[in-house]
Amino acid sequence: MQNELVVKSNQVIEASYRLSVVEQRVVLSAIAKIPKMSEVSDDEIYTVSVQDLQALGVHEKTAYRDLKEAVNRLYERSISLDIDDKLIKMRWVQRIEFTDNQGIIALRFSKDILPFISNVKANFTQYMLSEVSKMQGAY
């Protein structure tokens, strides 16, 4: 999982949004699972496990609690993008699921955010997911 590539539109990088460190790691773990250079629909569900977060530096004893809390907050979070002289506000995710006994959450990205995190061909930033574990803050 740590050797996965994360690709995001520069518009997302420059956008106005607030995510905690754990929320950011959940989003990036899910983005890393999006097939590169392929069309993705908003029907796709991506899973993030306790092990995924532990690999990114979340403490083992609190990983599931942190994951669950982060996903609950992420469900309420939005991102504001400046597109063609319009400020557009959209949600990160449209659905979340919990599988408590397996330590896994599932999320479905919102239809509006998908063009900025999947099949991005121009004006993007990419980095290895393993670099995320070195982040001390949310950005």
Which stretches of residues belong to each language-model region?
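Charged, alpha-helix-forming regions
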Residues: 1-139
